[in-house]
Amino acid sequence: MLFDQRGSGQSLPHGETAQNTTQDLIADIEVLRQQLGIEQWLLFGGSWGSTLALAYAIAHPERVSGLILRGIFLGTRAEVDWFLHDMGRFFPEAYDQFVSYLTVEERGDILLSYHEKLMDPQALVHQPAAERWASYETSCSTLRAGMRRVTGR
């Protein structure tokens, strides 16, 4: 069974961030489990979903038979810094596109600058910011190194 968490996918209202905390999402998962009459379940999650699955398992260990996690993201400062700064070394074109949306001043705090744009009520501001963020994340999700780069020949 798959579900879309608050504000994402087919969940309505789309893109809503009010009352959309990790604790709210954990509560939603628990309500869903109860409504489906599932005693214990195996959770699967990737990226943010891995974080959410782990948080749910910590809150409700008796309801989780196991976890299958991929692309694990724990939300640590080091992981966020890697995403915002260091990952660009491996994906320079994607990184350039990502930061080029920001002014030189805004690049001093990429996370804050994107947060402000993503939370802006005006679609002309938040939509392109969301597209740039998603494009960067998607571009960096796979590593396709050419054979020359791998073998050195």
PLM regions: where:
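Conserved alpha/beta-hydrolase
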Residues: 1-12
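Active-site-proximal flexible loops/turns
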Residues: 11-14, 35, 54, 78
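Catalytic nucleophile-loop/oxyanion-hole region of alpha/beta-hydrolase
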Residues: 14-25, 78-81, 85-86
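Conserved acidic catalytic loop of the alpha/beta-hydrolase fold
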Residues: 23-42, 59
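Conserved hydrolase catalytic core segment
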Residues: 39-85
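Alpha/beta-hydrolase
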Residues: 82, 87-153
